[in-house]
């Protein structure tokens, strides 16, 4: 089970969970390793990478995921495409895995 130790940001959670499930089911990582990798991915992701991710999600939804469209636009509006907006531990450190 993946849980959080404190309330977390919706957008960063969506990114972390998507990466976690990609690693868990597609790449067949064990859950603890997948969560650790997903946390690192979120921590290190740049504004440019995040905007690209949300744009792909919007495109994959055939234009129906307006939340992804808005998120991509928000990230594109940042001045520094190399900024890491989720680098602070508050966004990723609260996620924990418990289980076999």
Predicted regions and their residues:
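Short acidic/histidine-rich active-site segments
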Residues: 1-11
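An often Trp-containing, charged/polar helix-loop segment at the C-terminal end
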Residues: 13-100
């Amino acid at each position: 089970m993946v849980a959080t130790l404190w309330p977390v940001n919706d957008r960063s959670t969506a990114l972390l969970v998507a990466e976690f499930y990609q690693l868990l089911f597609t790449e067949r990582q064990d859950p603890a390793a997948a969560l650790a990798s997903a946390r690192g991915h979120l921590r290190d992701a740049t504004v440019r990478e995040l905007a690209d991710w949300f744009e792909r999600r919007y495109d994959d939804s055939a234009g129906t995921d307006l939340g992804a469209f808005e998120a991509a636009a928000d990230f594109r509006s940042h001045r520094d495409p190399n900024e890491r907006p989720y680098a602070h531990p508050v966004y990723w450190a609260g996620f924990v895995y418990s289980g076999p």
